[in-house]
């Protein structure tokens, strides 16, 4: 039986690799996913991407501008393009999880990012990643609340009279794969 926590960790690591590769090759993450998927279909010895890797890479690709804006707003004495490329990829994955992954508790997203920084980057990176993500975590509730308000306003303008904002549907590979609460999906609106 496979360990879902280790599976998610490896999927995150592969998402970081994929984002790093996309940036290095000046391609979009979606193009890399497409190439990897085609390769896995055509060659028996090439494993397909983990579904969570695809979900994360697609999510980061869709929200890169907002994610990078958050990173930039919390950098002190640094510019985004001066960060090590692997640190940018790690931060993008983690911030995507903080903002958009309903089934990943915030402390898990940060801890995973720090672990990836220990595995993949410089000696200074884990502390840097932890510090920056700690600052981002302070504003994520406001960001999620603002997103909910916008969604509710759109619904009201469309004539829907619901009093609550439904959670977004978990993307493929997300449902039931929580890292910390026995596989149950967190009931936090994000």
Swiss-Prot record:
Q: Where are the residues of the annotated region Disordered?
A: 158-190
Q: What keywords would UniProt list here?
A: RNA-binding, Transcription, Transcription antitermination, Transcription regulation
Give any GO molecular function from the UniProt entry. Answer: RNA binding
GO terms under cellular component: cytosol
Question: Which Gene Ontology terms describe the biological processes this protein takes part in?
Answer: DNA-templated transcription termination; transcription antitermination
Q: Say if the entry is tagged with keyword Isomerase.
A: no
Query: What Pfam families is this protein classified in?
Result: NusB (PF01029)
What does the similarity note say?
Belongs to the NusB family.
Q: Which NCBIfam families match?
A: nusB
**Functional summary from the UniProt entry:** Involved in transcription antitermination. Required for transcription of ribosomal RNA (rRNA) genes. Binds specifically to the boxA antiterminator sequence of the ribosomal RNA (rrn) operons.
Q: What is this protein called?
A: Transcription antitermination protein NusB
């Amino acid at each position: 039986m496979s360990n879902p926590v280790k599976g998610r960790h490896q999927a995150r690591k592969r998402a970081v690799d994929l984002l790093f590769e996309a940036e290095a090759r000046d391609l979009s993450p979606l193009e890399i996913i497409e190439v990897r998927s085609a390769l896995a279909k055509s060659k028996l010895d090439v494993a397909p991407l983990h579904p969570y890797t695809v979900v994360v890479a697609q999510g980061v690709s869709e929200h890169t501008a907002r994610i990078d804006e958050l990173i930039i707003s919390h950098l002190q004495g640094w510019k985004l393009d001066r960060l090590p490329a692997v640190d940018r990829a790690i931060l993008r994955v983690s911030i995507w999880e903080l903002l958009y992954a309903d089934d990943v508790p915030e402390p898990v997203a940060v801890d995973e990012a720090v672990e990836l920084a220990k595995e993949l980057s410089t000696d200074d990176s884990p502390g840097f990643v932890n510090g920056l993500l700690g600052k981002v975590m302070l504003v994520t509730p406001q960001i999620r609340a603002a997103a909910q308000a916008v969604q509710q306003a759109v619904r009201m303008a469309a004539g829907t009279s619901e009093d609550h904002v439904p959670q977004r549907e978990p993307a493929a590979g997300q449902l039931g794969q929580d890292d910390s609460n026995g596989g149950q999906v967190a009931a936090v609106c994000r």
